[in-house]
Regions:
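Short hydrophobic alpha-helical module
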Residues: 44, 50, 142, 176, ...
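Short amphipathic C-terminal alpha-helix that caps PH/PH-like domains
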Residues: 44, 113-114, 192-199
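Active-site environment of non-heme Fe oxygenases that use a 2-His-1-carboxylate facial triad
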Residues: 157, 174-175, 220-221
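Intrinsically disordered, low-complexity linker/assembly segments
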Residues: 168, 174-176, 191
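Ferredoxin-type iron-sulfur electron-transfer modules in oxidoreductases and energy-metabolism complexes
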Residues: 185
């Protein structure tokens, strides 16, 4: 608390407000908590596009959040899970990463994550039997600016686009593109799209009624409340990405206001900005 105020009093005053989900410290506490494994499982299946028997069903947290621990930064992913499969099917290993800034070092670090996670699967003196590795990255910049898609799978392929090794996959989700091109994705009813919209609604503290009947999102709505986070833990959390989210929200509201004042159709403004009609009218 740089201003010398009482952070406990701050948490008490704003206990029913929402934290910024994509903050490193906040997402770790929410998704890496044993009690929220249902949330994490649903999000992973949505991000990887897994359905039916391919779904992750009973994952285990490798580095669970422990109540009372402080947030920290390291060279490994904050959220890491494993999921056993029947028979001889290799075990799944899944990590979740969030990146707000488009820096060259991010790609280097992401490749380093993949290399380290893969290396850790091999035991000394044994023939390597690699697990099915999935690294999921939620990005707030375009990894593939020319692509019409916001979800991308990256694997080892040859020049004819044939997959050489299918147990090492990086899934990149361009969050910012999804909302910047909201009109393009307006009819996307995939589970991943639902997740992105639900998270965005909570980050903006907008009307959540659209998601209130979904049991998973109901839990999510409860877990992002500030009162779920201790003042001691919040003091260790870097909030710079929260500031960036606020800048993005302010930019979106400005676009909505200009479109409204120019006489644009309300349904179009809603699609483009993701804001509710009520919010747009009150700007």
């Amino acid at each position: 608390n740089n201003n010398g105020g009482d952070i406990d009093a701050f948490v008490k005053e704003y206990e029913h407000r929402n934290v910024y989900f994509y903050n490193d410290g906040c997402i770790k506490k929410i998704l890496a908590s044993e009690k929220n494994i249902m949330l994490t499982t649903d999000l992973v299946n949505a991000a990887l596009g897994l359905i039916g028997s391919d779904r992750i069903t009973n994952p285990k947290l490798v580095n669970p959040f422990i109540p009372g621990e402080l947030g920290y930064r390291g060279v490994e992913p904050d959220i890491l899970l494993t999921n056993d499969r029947d028979g001889d099917t290799p075990r799944d290993r899944i990590s979740i990463e969030v990146q707000h800034e488009d820096k060259r070092v991010f790609r280097d670090r992401l490749v380093l994550y993949v290399a380290r996670l893969t290396s850790n699967m091999a035991r000394k003196g044994e023939n390597p039997r690699l697990e099915n590795l999935n690294v999921v990255g939620f990005q707030f910049f375009d990894a593939f600016p020319e692509s019409a898609n916001y979800r991308h799978t990256v694997q080892l392929r040859n020049q004819e686009q044939q997959v050489y090794f299918d147990r090492q996959t990086v899934t990149l989700i361009e969050v910012e593109k999804f909302f910047r091109k909201a009109e393009r994705f307006a009819d996307d009813s995939s589970r991943l799209a639902q997740w992105l919209r639900a998270i965005d609604t909570l980050n903006r503290e907008a009307d959540f009624s659209e998601f209130a009947n979904d049991p998973v999102f109901k839990v999510l709505q409860n877990e992002v409340k500030l009162c779920r986070f201790s003042s001691r833990y919040l003091m260790t959390v870097d909030m710079s990405d929260f500031d960036k989210a606020m800048e993005r929200y302010e930019a979106i509201t400005e676009i909505a206001k200009k479109m409204r004042d120019m006489g644009a159709d309300m349904s179009l403004i809603v699609k483009v900005t993701g804001l509710s009609e009520k919010t747009i009218r009150e700007l």
